[in-house]
Amino acid sequence: MPTINQLVRKPRKTPARINRVPALNKNPLKRGICSKVYTTTPKKPNSALRKVARVRLSGGAEVIAYIPGEGHNLQEHSVVCIRGGRVKDLPGVRYHIVRGVFDTEGVKGRKKGRSKYGAKKS
């Protein structure tokens, strides 16, 4: 344990916060264009075909983003909106596509949690 004198000479340094979404560049959302839409499999012990897209952002960065909800209409050259938020069982996927914005349609027939999936009240 340091003495008061040592702390006066050299104060404690707080560790720098790591940025988990560097491509967003301190923005809450960013626009991008899909360069590839595909499915990938999660880490053990999970098993599925998760829908993801490689997206070139307006800042020039290329990221992999998850497409949430059941069914989607995305294809190459679709314009999408990206937010932060990783998918725990997909390594390298640190962004989510926002449903119901730009070319992304909302989830059809969604009754609960509609605001998260861009679904209109039916």
Swiss-Prot record:
UniProt entry tagged with the keyword Ligase: no
3-methylthioaspartic acid: residues carrying this PTM: D89
One GO biological process term: translation
Entry GO terms, CC: small ribosomal subunit
Any one GO molecular-function label of the UniProt entry: structural constituent of ribosome
UniProt keywords, alphabetically: Methylation, Ribonucleoprotein, Ribosomal protein, RNA-binding, rRNA-binding, tRNA-binding
CDD domains the record matches: Ribosomal_S12
Pfam families documented for this protein: Ribosom_S12_S23
UniProt function note: With S4 and S5 plays an important role in translational accuracy.
The family this protein is said to belong to: Belongs to the universal ribosomal protein uS12 family.
Stored PANTHER family: 30S RIBOSOMAL PROTEIN S12 FAMILY MEMBER
HAMAP family found in the cross-reference section: Ribosomal_uS12_B
Subunit structure: Part of the 30S ribosomal subunit. Contacts proteins S8 and S17. May interact with IF1 in the 30S initiation complex.
Name of the protein this chain belongs to: Small ribosomal subunit protein uS12
Lineage: Bacteria, Pseudomonadati, Pseudomonadota, Alphaproteobacteria, Rickettsiales
Gene that encodes the chain: rpsL
